[in-house]
């Protein structure tokens, strides 16, 4: 990578996962925590296509290398965080990219997270068995 190459940053979060994404002009490689993307995502094609969806929407799959530092959560949560990070980096790349990404919903952070456990219950909503007598 040359010193004057343009680098675009984006941060994505999903559940407990956080992904810091760098877009660098290149051949379309995805590297997550120093490992190839398909290997890191356990060769699960739906997660791979989920993570690269913003690039496919804009037709830029083979124009940028994606370097990701992901932490927290599980593999699926990290894939969702990577998707949001890539979308935000693409908005930084060009403001014209914002509209198609917004229409597809790639710029919205998914607020769903694990609900906390309440005292008196076994799980977040599961109550102990009720006995009438």
From Swiss-Prot:
InterPro entries: Ribosomal_Su5_D2-typ_SF, Ribosomal_uS9, Ribosomal_uS9_bac/plastid, Ribosomal_uS9_CS, Ribsml_uS5_D2-typ_fold_subgr. This is Small ribosomal subunit protein uS9. It comes from Gloeobacter violaceus (strain ATCC 29082 / PCC 7421). One of its GO terms (molecular function) is structural constituent of ribosome. NCBIfam families: PRK00132.1. One of its GO terms (biological process) is translation. Keywords: Ribonucleoprotein, Ribosomal protein. Residues 102-113 have a biased composition (Basic and acidic residues). The keyword NAD does not apply. Residues 114-133 have a biased composition (Basic residues).
